[in-house]
From Swiss-Prot:
InterPro entries: DNA-dir_RNA_pol_bsu_ext_1_sf, DNA-dir_RNA_pol_bsu_external_1, DNA-dir_RNA_pol_su2, DNA-dir_RNAP_su2_dom, DNA-dir_RNAP_su2_hyb_sf, RNA_pol_bsu_bac, RNA_pol_bsu_CS, RNA_pol_bsu_protrusion. One of its GO terms (biological process) is DNA-templated transcription. HAMAP family: RNApol_bact_RpoB. The RNAP catalytic core consists of 2 alpha, 1 beta, 1 beta' and 1 omega subunit. When a sigma factor is associated with the core the holoenzyme is formed, which can initiate transcription. GO terms for cellular component: DNA-directed RNA polymerase complex. It catalyses: RNA(n) + a ribonucleoside 5'-triphosphate = RNA(n+1) + diphosphate. The keyword tRNA processing does not apply. DNA-dependent RNA polymerase catalyzes the transcription of DNA into RNA using the four ribonucleoside triphosphates as substrates. It comes from the Bacteria. Keywords: DNA-directed RNA polymerase, Nucleotidyltransferase, Transcription, Transferase. Pfam families: RNA_pol_Rpb2_1, RNA_pol_Rpb2_2, RNA_pol_Rpb2_3, RNA_pol_Rpb2_45, RNA_pol_Rpb2_6, RNA_pol_Rpb2_7. This is DNA-directed RNA polymerase subunit beta.
Length: 1357
């Protein structure tokens, strides 16, 4: 394989044995693809597919007026251009969105004509609000903050059969039910009651007998019975009664008479149970009629009404039970044929028949009225109202939609072959569902498993946005219908009919405040990527935390390869919020699919198929680690497989599919944990969750022991700068990289230059620092997809969340008791865990009713020293180091007791008497914060004069833009002239500046000309003249284009900012705060091994080895056995080997060994100890040297999950590094120099500093605000709260009998308002007496009692 620009600089030793059949897919595809389909941005009218916005419009339009004389049709839509780019939106606090313009057609029909002739057509584009755009990293910028829309896992529409698990009735009887769930519309439930009658519920209202619904559909009793039951036919001939025999139906019954064949031979004796053997004999004997006694009919149910043969009078209605009296009537009327329902207790129960018996309705109208009463209790029913209501419930496309998914699931579940059909229900659908339900109750068929991923589907961003959009459009539709009737009379245009506000409001509400629109976690690249790959069962139309039971949260066999069984939050959301597995994707119906390799006759092919949970059930699927021979055949006698959602073993020839990779089971975060297979699941869960909380350190350090997924995560997260096109690095500095694009990648009309402006010290959503550093040098050749610059937590294009620390597992004076961590001072000195946090502080100047607030350096009653960091505009300088309480932005607010008269205002304006009536409301640095000002932004409302600071910031920004554009032009111009030079040199000229006719043009001549004079050359060859003209035109076009671009940016910068009403000016100050690691900070490894730093020890006191190398961290060995996360120990051993090899390479470099020796040693490391072979021969000597230099700090290793390094390979690595194979060494106590009594495990572990810093949690208060009601201090750091002398503290003082102290505590020191102020006054006056009054809490108590309706008063005697 060819190495990319960054890979060849540092190759990871890979221990995996299994081949890569399939690359890890693009990790953000689920977000980007979904939203791309929703917008269909570049599509023309013909290319529009019936999805997303287009589908939403088509479902609501055409809108027809109530009279039917006017209609509004939808033609198409187009999206405009965004006003600002992503960075500008974040800065200005606006939404990154594009205007949506919809072309609609208003058609007015001629009232007079009979056949709806068209009288008038008007077509117009209508603005329908703004649609947020997704950034290229799968996020949305809403009001300046970066948000993510999390996908939702919800119950798929369709039909589901279930039972109550015996919980409803005390007998424990299983009550079966069926539920038809549409995508939108009313739910329809059928359920059995303990007496085995079937009931129906609509939208979970009160239940009605199911037959009411069937009657409402127009079925008669007889049709209902025919649909559900077979019939037994009896013939009456005089005194004999003959049954038309269907032998199969007799099975399991007890013979009430002897059953004989034609010859009179007894086949079944009376009283015997009829078995399958008897039935075979009856069929062989060809018995078709069976004479039965008349009492055989008693208790049977009539299937067809019995009619008097002579008079036509109905003797018995269908579905009545035959009694002796009825039989007598039948015999008297000489009826010759009776049909009864065939039912039995085993597999054909009389459920529908029983239901009809408890049904009070007798015809369709009564049934409709009954349903109307249930849906709209208290309203008088009319025939029309009842019919309309019922028709709209399930049979109107506007109110009810199963959706394509629902129809497919519905048809599959009830056993139909076609998977397409209408979105509304039909009579047959309802009958089929009831039949299936009755079959299940009869013991044929099984209930569904609701937690099966074939019954839950994923709703992605696009689909949710489309639903919201449709909601908005339906609101618009109501308004448009009202106005359409006016349209014809008043000659209105489409624009006058459509008010886009409801659409815009629906979209805004969804992106701004939906439960699934979340503030993006931006601690580090991994937390971004996992947030976008989240799948939540919560949210609108989903579950709620309180109602979700254990089953929904549990791991299901179908999660395999679709949803990660490890990564889920701890706490109330466990199992409800999941992460997508590495290779999972959604299919067109929204079901999660996983990839598999096809296996034919035990030969594994390279063909890959993606299957959903339903499709995979019938397959026999081998694991990715199954042993194959050279030909790719399965060789084991029995292979571990999955079949029918069970784990079992099968012969190789039965296997039909095979997993693609061992890591397809887990999510991205879990696949970053090396030796995951040796960790307990609970700890792995904590490990994958804590990696997301790691704070990017000052200098990222790649993990010595990784899994090989680090590069994918860094590349796909979007924090690195990736080359869009290949080329040569033209120039590079800390803030930008300029690439001159290779000629073969430049398309005509494009600029042959790519400029990448790097993000420098920007604040993330979590206040961590986003900073990019270039990796390339001038003149380097890069290819498309190479990494040009590292972002936060990335090191040479690999994810690097923490630091490699030398750890020892040993107790150390109790400092590592209970998971505490003992750190060496060296870690702090080397800034290993120093992080930068950026805080944004905002100062807003508003227009108050006493006059405008002003931002100024002229602040009353503030000394000169406090103002020395402000400029003349009253805003702090960039670069100033500030402490808590320093002024950042000076601001004064008018404080007038009285409102001024116009005359006074004028006098004030003339004489400028300010100080007397303004108060200081400056923005100050909050308590407990000190840092450096790194940026200031000033936003001014239109029409308000901009201050000097705003102008200087604007000038700086313009200079930067101009510099970029000039650079671009310089390269384009340079490339054009180079091409011209190649064509001109050596060609003959007709004339030109200081040139005779027929002279050959030389390099020297061209160098002597200014570039503008080149175009004055007249060549002998006309083609060259044409080329010169084209070049001249191209260059002037380019210049014009860039000038226009500059003017456009300038216009945007100079126009006023769109601020909230009443706001005149906003100043944002960004502070960078450097945080070193200190006791109280939380740290963790990748295996769920977390702890708090307890002490930072001097280097000389730390345990050290025989060479005098001290360890960085001492961890408690007792944290390992009970937690069962042994992966950390293996990581420590392999880390030691990696570091040891790096030191060995370093010694070779210092001794200036030959390149051949280096190459040989590298070959030993990479290719002789297990795992994947690396092709070092394709690297030249210089590249080998560069590689060796980068490996000095340690040779990075990759042990992929479930396919990692074996114990023997770790030992071999340790041996190669000349280290003890046990991974243990003798340590010495740094304080005494004595050797510890036994060898200690020492090695390198990757440690993270988590975003739970003691600085953010520690807080102190002397005086501060009080709660309004109780007059006690507020609680918590955010409210600047204090401590409360609470109930238990009062008990303590009571126990001591310290009455005076207690009185003081409960009154003047706490919430006796008058007492406190009096006390303060007394202390100032030097009078140390105390007068205790009434504590506010007592008043609260009295108010509480009064609120219960008890009159209580405190009377003073």
């Amino acid at each position: 394989m060819a190495y990319s620009y960054t890979e060849k600089k540092r190759i990871r030793k890979d221990f995996s044995k299994l081949p890569d059949v399939m690359d890890v897919p693009y990790l953000l595809a689920i977000q980007l693809d979904s939203y791309r389909e929703f917008l269909q941005a570049g599509a023309t009218k013909e290319q529009f597919r019936d999805i997303g916005l287009h589908a939403a419009f088509k479902s609501v339009f055409p809108i027809i007026s109530y009279s039917g004389n006017a209609a509004l049709e939808y033609v198409g839509y187009r999206l405009g251009e965004p006003a600002f780019d992503v960075k500008e939106c974040v800065l200005r606090g606006v939404t990154f969105a594009v205007p949506l313009r919809v072309k609609v057609r208003l058609i007015i029909f001629d009232r007079e004509s009979s056949n709806k002739a068209i009288k008038d057509i008007k077509e117009q584009e209508v603005y329908m609000g703004e649609i947020p755009l997704m950034t290229e990293n799968g996020t949305f910028i809403i009001n300046g903050t970066e948000r993510v829309i999390v996908s939702q896992l919800h119950r798929s529409p369709g039909v589901f059969f279930d039972h109550d698990r015996g919980k409803t009735h005390s007998s424990g009887k299983l009550l079966y039910s069926a539920r038809i769930i549409p995508y939108r519309g009313s739910w329809l439930d059928f359920e059995f009651d303990p007496k085995d009658c079937v009931f129906v519920r609509i939208d979970r209202r009160r239940k009605l007998p199911a037959s009411v619904l069937l009657r409402a559909l127009g079925y008669s009793t007889e049709e209902i019975l025919n649909a559900f039951y077979a019939t037994n036919v009896f013939h009456i001939k005089g005194e004999t009664l003959n049954l038309e025999l269907v032998p199969q139906r007799l099975r399991g019954e007890v013979a009430s008479i002897d059953i004989k064949d034609g010859s009179g031979k007894v086949i079944v004796e009376q009283g015997r149970r009829i078995t399958a053997r008897h039935i075979n004999q009856l069929e062989k004997a060809g018995v078709s009629q069976l004479e039965v006694p008349f009492d055989y009919l008693i208790g049977r149910t009539i299937a067809k009404a019995i009619v008097h043969p002579a008079t036509g009078e109905i003797i018995a209605e269908c579905n009545t039970e035959l009694t002796l009296d009825l039989l007598a009537k039948v015999a008297k009327a000489q009826v010759v044929r009776i049909e009864t329902l065939y039912t039995n207790d085993i597999d054909c129960g009389p459920f529908i028949s029983d239901t009809l018996k408890i049904d009070n309705t007798s015809n369709q109208l009564e049934a409709l009225v009954e349903i109307y009463r249930m849906m709209r209790p208290g309203e008088p029913p009319t025939k029309e109202a009842a019919e309309t209501l019922f028709g709209n419930l399930f049979f109107s496309a506007e109110r009810y939609d199963l959706s394509a998914v629902g129809r497919m699931k519905f048809n599959r579940r009830i056993g139909r072959t076609e998977i397409e059909g209408p979105g509304v229900l039909s009579k047959e659908d309802i009958i089929d569902v009831l039949k299936t339900l009755v079959d299940i109750r009869n013991g044929k068929g099984i209930v569904d498993d609701i937690d099966h991923l074939g019954n839950r589907r994923v709703r992605c961003v696009g689909e949710m946005a489309e639903n919201q959009f449709r909601v908005g459009l339906v609101r618009v539709e109501r308004a448009v219908k009202e106005r359409l009737s006016m349209a014809e009379s008043e000659g209105l245009m489409p624009q006058d009919l459509i008010n886009a506000k409801p659409v815009a409001a629906a979209i805004k509400e969804f992106f701004g405040s939906s439960q699934l629109s979340q503030f993006m976690g931006q601690n580090n690249p991994l937390s971004e990527i996992t947030h976008k790959r989240r799948v939540s069962a919560l949210g609108p139309g989903g579950l709620t935390r309180e109602r979700a039971g254990f089953e929904v949260r549990d791991v299901h066999p179908t999660h395999y390869g679709r949803v990660c069984p490890i990564e889920t939050p701890e706490g109330p959301n466990i199992g409800l919020i999941n992460s997508l597995a590495t290779y999972a994707r959604t299919n067109k119906y929204g079901f999660l699919e996983s990839p598999y390799r096809v296996v034919k006759d035990s030969l594994v092919t390279d063909e890959i198929v993606f299957l959903s949970a339903i499709e995979e059930a019938d397959h026999v699927i081998a694991q990715a680690s199954a042993t194959l021979n050279e030909k790719g055949q399965l060789v084991d006698e029995l292979v571990a497989v999955r079949h029918l959602n069970e784990f079992t073993v099968k012969a190789p020839e039965d296997v039909t599919l095979m997993d693609v990779s061992p890591k397809q089971v887990v999510s991205v975060a879990a696949s970053l944990i090396p030796f995951l297979e040796h960790d307990d699941a609970n700890r792995a869960l904590m490990g994958s969750n804590m990696q997301r909380q790691a704070v990017p350190t000052l200098r990222a350090d790649k993990p010595l022991v990784g899994t090989g997924m680090e590069r994918n995560v860094a590349r796909d997260s979007g924090v690195c700068v990736v080359a869009r096109r290949g080329g040569v690095i033209d120039s590079v500095d800390a803030s930008r990289v300029v690439v001159r694009v290779a000629d073969d990648e430049v398309e005509t009309g494009e600029a042959g230059v790519d400029i990448y402006n790097l993000t420098k010290y920007t604040r993330s959503n979590q206040n961590t620092c986003i900073n990019q550093r270039p990796l390339v040098s001038k003149g380097d050749v890069v290819a498309r997809g190479d990494i040009l610059a590292d972002g936060p937590s990335t090191d040479m294009g690999e994810l690097a969340l923490g630091q490699n620390m030398r750890v020892a597992f040993m107790p150390w004076n109790g400092f590592n008791f209970e998971d505490s961590i003992c750190l060496s001072e060296r870690v702090v000195q080397e800034d290993r865990f120093t992080t930068i946090h950026i805080q944004e502080l905002t100062c807003v100047a508003r227009d108050t009713k006493l006059g405008p607030e002003e931002i100024t350096a002229d602040i009353p009653n503030v000394g000169e020293a406090a103002l020395n960091k402000l400029d003349e505009a009253g805003i702090v300088y960039v670069g100033a180091e500030v402490q808590a309480g320093d002024i950042l932005v000076g601001k004064v607010t008018p404080k007038g007791e009285t409102q001024l008269t116009p005359e006074e205002k004028l006098l004030r304006a003339i004489f400028g008497e300010k100080a007397s009536d303004v108060k200081d409301t400056s923005l100050r640095v909050p308590t407990g914060t000190k840092g450096t000002v790194i940026d200031v932004q000033v936003f001014t409302r239109d029409g308000v004069e901009r201050d000097s600071r705003a102008l200087s910031i604007e000038k700086m920004q313009l200079d930067q833009i101009r510099k970029d554009l000039n650079e671009e032009f310089r390269i384009v111009e340079g490339a054009t002239f180079e091409r011209l030079r190649a064509a001109l040199v050596g060609a003959k000229a007709e004339g030109g500046p200081a040139l005779k006719k027929g002279t050959e043009i030389t390099d020297d001549y061209l160098d002597g000309l200014e570039r503008g004079q080149w175009f004055k050359l007249r060549m002998a060859d006309d083609a060259l003249n044409e080329q010169l003209e084209k070049a001249q035109a191209y260059i002037s076009d380019r210049r014009q284009l860039l000038d226009d671009k500059f003017e456009d940016k300038k216009r945007k910068l100079q126009q006023g900012d769109d601020l909230a009403p009443g706001v005149l000016k906003i100043v944002k100050v960004y502070l960078a705060i450097k945080r070193r690691i200190q006791p109280g900070d939380k740290m963790a490894g990748r295996h769920g091994n977390k702890g708090v730093v307890s002490v930072i020890m001097p280097v000389e006191d730390m345990p050290h080895d025989a060479n005098g190398t001290p360890v960085d961290i001492v961890l408690n060995p007792l944290g390992v056995p009970s937690r069962m996360n042994v992966g950390q120990i293996l990581e420590t051993h392999l880390g030691l080997a990696a570091k040891g090899l790096g030191e060995k390479i370093n010694r070779m470099l210092e001794e200036q060994r030959k390149v051949a020796e280096l190459r040989k040693f590298l070959h030993e490391i990479y290719n002789e100890i297990g795992g994947r072979e690396e092709n070092l021969d394709e690297l030249g000597d210089n590249e080998i040297l560069a590689l060796a230099k980068n490996l000095r700090g340690g040779v990075p290793m990759a042990t992929p999950v479930f396919d990692g390094a074996k114990e023997r390979e770790i030992k071999a690595m340790l041996k190669l590094a000349d280290l003890p194979e046990s991974g243990q060494m003798r340590l010495f106590d740094g304080r005494t120099g004595n050797q510890f009594e036994r060898p200690t495990t020492v090695g390198y572990m990757y440690m993270l500093k988590l975003n739970h810093l003691v600085d953010d949690k520690m807080h102190a208060r002397s005086t501060g605000s009080y709660s309004l009601v109780t007059q006690q201090p507020l609680g918590g750091k955010a409210q600047f709260g204090g401590q409360r002398f609470g109930e238990m503290e009062v008990w303590a003082l009571e126990a001591y009998g310290a009455a005076y102290t207690l009185q003081e505590m409960l009154t003047v020191k706490s919430d006796d308002v008058n007492g406190r102020t009096k006390m303060y006054k007394n202390i100032v006056d030097g009078d140390h007496r105390m007068e205790a009054g009434m504590p506010e809490s007592f008043n609260v108590l009295i108010k509480e009692i009064r609120s219960l309706g008890i009159d209580i008063e405190l009377e003073t005697e």
